[in-house]
C-alpha cells in the first residue's frame, strides 16, 4: 500500500456509468492490520463482459478496439470514515511486473464512506494494446486522515489480440470496391494509351481497275 499527498495526484476525466451507495452490516471482525494491509478497506471488482472474473483464475481474452466495464465495490471496515476520490490502474508485464501501459487517473466523488458502508462504481476502459499477455492491476485512491492512500486489489491475467478481419465487413467491402475501381481505371488507361493502336486493323489500299486490256480488245474488233 502506498501513501501519497493529495497535491501529488492529478485526477482527471470521468469514466463512470453509475455511482451508488448502500449500507452493508457485514464486517470483517477478525481483521488484523499488517504492513501490507494496515487498513480494513476491501476492494473487489468484476469485468462486466466476463462475469465472475474476480473469483476466477482463468485467462481473460480481450480484443483491441473493444471497451470493457470494470465495476468496483469498495467496503469500509474502519471505525473512521474514508473518502473514495479516484481510480486508475495499469497493464503490466506478467513476468517482470513492469508497467507497460498506465490508465489515466479518473476522479470519483469524492464520496465519504462511513463504517460498514459500500461504494460501487463502473470504470470504462478502451483496449488498445500490443497483442500479448498482461496483468491488469487496478488502483483505487482513498482519502483517510488527510492522507491519500493507493489501494490495490486482485491482479487479473489477460491476453490481448487484434480483431479478425472479415471480407464481408462494410469497411472491407468499401476498400475492395475502391481497389476494383482503381484497377479497372488502370486497365482502361493502358488500353487507351497502347492497346487501341495495337488492336486497330491495318488500312488496305484500294484496288485499281484494269482498263488497258479491254480497250485493246475493243480496238481489234472494230478493225
Curated annotation (Swiss-Prot):
Domain of life assignment: Eukaryota
Ranges facing Lumenal side: 24-171
Localization per Swiss-Prot or TrEMBL: Endoplasmic reticulum membrane
Residues exposed to the Cytoplasmic side: 193-223
Alphabetized UniProt keyword annotations: Endoplasmic reticulum, Membrane, Signal, Transmembrane, Transmembrane helix
Span list, region Disordered: 204-223
Protein name stated in the entry: Increased recombination centers protein 22
Organism of provenance: Komagataella phaffii (strain GS115 / ATCC 20864) (Yeast)
Gene: IRC22
